[in-house]
């Protein structure tokens, strides 16, 4: 049910990491803050979340008199009609919520209750101020590019998917190496054996691609990153291409079967001899921004980078 604030109907979808008591308590705080502001709240729940939802909707929780809460289940319509998706958790929970936000073409706001939480806009200790900004609509929305992934066998499309962070092409058996040929914009670049190949967005450059040795790319820069993983070749270095490039990875016939993991959540089968084509996604993910802090400051804070000795430029 949508609540009405100053003549305007507003509703927000809450997606929280299941099973953690601290997140359950935080979710109750969110519900009560939105109740006071006259904003309706949807809570995402699936079967694995049932015990958490029961705790959140007990009398002292979300079902307090006058509190407008609707329980919804995962699906393409879960977020339709909402103003935004609010995430309580880490990056895994954020990626789960991003699927729903993209389908509904609404922005997503992450509150980090995980470990690093690079995708989150703010930390748990700033929850009240973040929610106050949402209530006052004092936020801006930016778009983050995504990836569209297609798998072909003999020019026939057998599967497709999308990713916000990265598409990870990996050896299915984990035995031996995956033999691939890398192609950019219709031209072969290198053939090599490897554990896998990552194709990442700038948003994903601080995730799996970073762990595999790829560069950190500022989110304002639109580009595609290609990062081979444990490649057995002289030239198998990370590449940064145009955002309009077509990246293709062909698995050599007679090599191992592979798998393509989209954000580590959605899995596509990759038979030996198949071809993976990855391009800039047609539908971006919308991102709630609460402040204009430089990306460098966020990176230093999240990764706890040493900056002792920095003097800076004098004005």
From Swiss-Prot:
GO biological process, any: NAD metabolic process
Molecular-function GO terms, alphabetical: ATP binding; metal ion binding; NAD binding; NAD+ kinase activity
Pfam families linked: NAD_kinase, NAD_kinase_C
The keyword Acetylation appears for this protein: no
EC number(s) stated in the UniProt entry for this protein: 2.7.1.23
Catalyses which reaction(s): NAD(+) + ATP = ADP + NADP(+) + H(+)
Binding-site list for NAD(+): 91-92, 96, 165-166, 195, 206-211
A single GO cellular-component term on record: cytoplasm
UniProt keyword annotations, A-Z: ATP-binding, Cytoplasm, Kinase, NAD, NADP, Nucleotide-binding, Transferase
Function: Involved in the regulation of the intracellular balance of NAD and NADP, and is a key enzyme in the biosynthesis of NADP. Catalyzes specifically the phosphorylation on 2'-hydroxyl of the adenosine moiety of NAD to yield NADP.
Name of the protein this chain belongs to: NAD kinase
Organism for this UniProt entry: Rhodococcus erythropolis (strain PR4 / NBRC 100887)
UniProt gene name: nadK
């Amino acid at each position: 049910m949508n609540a009405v604030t100053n003549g305007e109907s507003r509703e927000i979808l809450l997606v929280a990491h299941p099973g953690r008591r601290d997140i359950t308590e935080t979710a109750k705080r969110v519900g009560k803050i939105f109740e006071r502001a006259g904003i309706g709240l949807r809570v995402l729940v699936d079967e694995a979340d049932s015990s958490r939802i029961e705790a959140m909707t007990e009398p002292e929780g979300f079902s307090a008199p006058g509190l407008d809460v609707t329980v919804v289940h995962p699906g393409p319509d879960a977020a339709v009609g909402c103003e935004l998706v609010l995430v309580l958790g880490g990056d895994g929970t954020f990626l789960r919520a991003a699927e729903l936000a993209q389908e509904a073409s609404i922005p997503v706001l992450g509150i980090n209750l995980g470990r690093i939480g690079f995708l989150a806009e703010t930390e748990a200790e700033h929850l009240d101020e973040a929610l106050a900004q949402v209530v006052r609509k004092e936020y801006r929305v930016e778009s983050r590019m995504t990836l569209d992934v297609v798998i072909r066998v003999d020019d026939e499309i057998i599967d497709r998917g999308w990713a916000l962070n990265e598409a990870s092409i990996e050896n299915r058996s984990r035995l031996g190496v995956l033999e691939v040929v890398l192609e950019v914009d219709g031209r072969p670049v290198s053939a090599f054996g490897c554990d896998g190949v990552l194709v990442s967005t700038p948003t994903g450059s601080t995730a799996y691609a970073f762990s595999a040795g790829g560069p950190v790319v500022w989110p304002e820069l639109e580009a595609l990153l290609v990062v081979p993983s444990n490649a057995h070749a002289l030239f198998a270095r990370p590449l940064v291409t145009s955002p309009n490039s077509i990246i293709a990875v062909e698995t050599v016939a007679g090599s191992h079967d592979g798998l393509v993991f989209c954000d580590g959540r959605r899995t596509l089968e990759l038979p030996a001899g198949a071809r993976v084509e990855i391009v800039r996604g047609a539908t971006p993910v919308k991102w709630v921004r609460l402040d204009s802090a430089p990306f460098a400051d966020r990176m230093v804070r999240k990764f706890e980078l040493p900056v002792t000795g920095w003097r800076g430029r004098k004005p």
